[in-house]
């Protein structure tokens, strides 16, 4: 059979997806985290892989799904949180713009799976399945009640799940995980389609969403999930030492407030008394596309006058950030390679070819 006749859509997908294959899985496994540091990788959206100096591996909000894929239905799903928020009827054009950089089914070494809340782009059945099938049988699944309900519904044993609410602390080897208040107002209007939000007192945020503070021997990481800006960030900053803070940033469409703005990101960094502030979530949805350089420009305008004690860092999906080695850097660039140039003799017709 000729090659063009043997190739199918399925063979094409299997040969190209996930786009990074197991490259990042291998990089994370091989990483030796130095004492006094921690390393983390951005998995897309708010997905983070954190590795401590003791070799403890945890992932948060690792999501392997996609967005809109067809114009077939021009209408938004009835009762969707964005419909409730803005009174819209048209389909939200939220296409996934980020490649899949980590293969969940190539994960072998992991010590905990966490989720901040139960929105589709923050918790994933494929990740749960991969960990259940391929990893140790005591890896815990940690999250607020709504997330645990999802995991159990997917088939994760109840005894493998840990429900957390603000104030709870869970120890996973050398990482101390503090569950803190979340400020995700969108989560409170994520309801069954037949349930009305108008005129009804929302249920408690604590069952739906949490923020996390990861305290490692080498430093601390604050993960804010999908939280909006809140003055209560200052309380978290008063009560905890926060080295690196991650915030959900994006360009909100007309009539929508779902992501923090550049000004919100700076206010969050100041309130938390963080050393480094990193935007995420802006990478994933086409209709929330935002330029993170705006954060740095605004920071440059304000830093001297307001005496900011933090710096912004502009990351790339799949990239690594090491605290405190990268604390004075402003931007990430993927490894460029070719550091071993001219270690062997070039094979060229003549030197002037160079």
UniProtKB/Swiss-Prot annotation:
Induction: Induced by L-ascorbate. Repressed by UlaR. InterPro entries: L-ascorbate_6P_UlaG, Metallo-B-lactamas, RibonucZ/Hydroxyglut_hydro, UlaG-like_MBL-fold, UPF0173_UPF0282_UlaG_hydrolase. Keywords: Cytoplasm, Hydrolase. GO terms for cellular component: cytoplasm. The keyword Hydrolase applies. GO terms for biological process: L-ascorbic acid catabolic process. CDD domains: UlaG-like_MBL-fold. It comes from the Bacteria. Its cofactor is a divalent metal cation. Its main location: cytoplasm. It catalyses: L-ascorbate 6-phosphate + H2O = 3-dehydro-L-gulonate 6-phosphate. Its EC number is 3.1.1.-. Signal peptide: none annotated. GO terms for molecular function: hydrolase activity; L-ascorbate 6-phosphate lactonase activity; manganese ion binding. Pathway: Cofactor degradation; L-ascorbate degradation; D-xylulose 5-phosphate from L-ascorbate: step 1/4. It is found in: Cytoplasm. Probably catalyzes the hydrolysis of L-ascorbate-6-P into 3-keto-L-gulonate-6-P. Is essential for L-ascorbate utilization under anaerobic conditions. Also shows phosphodiesterase activity, hydrolyzing phosphodiester bond in the artificial chromogenic substrate bis-p-nitrophenyl phosphate (bis-pNPP). Belongs to the UlaG family. HAMAP family: UlaG. NCBIfam families: PRK11709.1. PANTHER family: L-ASCORBATE-6-PHOSPHATE LACTONASE ULAG-RELATED (PTHR43546:SF9), UPF0173 METAL-DEPENDENT HYDROLASE MJ1163-RELATED (PTHR43546). This is Probable L-ascorbate-6-phosphate lactonase UlaG. It comes from Escherichia coli (strain K12).
């Amino acid at each position: 059979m000729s090659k063009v006749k043997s190739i199918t859509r399925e063979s094409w997908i299997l040969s190209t997806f996930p786009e990074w294959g197991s490259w990042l899985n291998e990089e994370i496994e091989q990483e030796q985290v130095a004492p006094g540091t921690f390393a983390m990788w951005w998995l897309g959206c708010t997905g983070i892989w954190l590795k401590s100096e003791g070799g403890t591996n945890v992932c948060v909000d690792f999501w392997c799904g996609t967005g809109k894929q067809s114009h077939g239905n021009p209408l938004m799903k009835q009762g969707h949180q964005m419909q409730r928020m803005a009174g819209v009827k048209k389909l939200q054009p939220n296409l996934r713009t980020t490649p899949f950089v980590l293969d969940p089914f190539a994960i072998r070494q992991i010590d905990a799976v966490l989720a901040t809340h139960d929105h589709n782009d923050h918790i994933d059945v494929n990740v749960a399945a991969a960990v259940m099938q391929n990893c140790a049988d005591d890896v815990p699944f940690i999250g607020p009640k709504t997330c645990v309900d999802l995991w159990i519904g997917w088939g994760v044993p109840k005894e493998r799940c840990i429900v957390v609410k603000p104030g709870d602390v869970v120890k996973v080897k050398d990482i101390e995980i503090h569950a803190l208040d979340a400020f995700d107002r969108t989560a409170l209007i994520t309801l069954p389609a037949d349930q009305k939000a108008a005129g009804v007192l929302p249920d408690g945020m604590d069952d739906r969403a949490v923020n996390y503070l990861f305290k490692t021997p080498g430093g601390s990481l604050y993960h804010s999930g999908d939280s909006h800006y809140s003055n209560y960030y200052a309380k978290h900053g008063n009560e905890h030492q926060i080295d690196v803070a991650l915030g959900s940033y994006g360009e909100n469409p007309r009539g929508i407030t779902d992501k923090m703005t550049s000004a919100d990101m700076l206010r969050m960094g100041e309130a938390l008394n963080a050393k480094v502030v990193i935007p995420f979530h802006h990478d994933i949805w086409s209709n929330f596309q935002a330029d993170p350089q705006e954060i740095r420009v605004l920071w440059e305008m304000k830093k001297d006058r307001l005496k900011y004690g933090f710096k912004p860092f502009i990351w790339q999906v799949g990239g690594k950030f090491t605290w405190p080695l990268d604390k004075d850097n402003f931007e990430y660039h993927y490894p460029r390679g070719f550091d071993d140039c001219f270690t062997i003799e070039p094979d060229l017709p003549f030197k002037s070819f160079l």
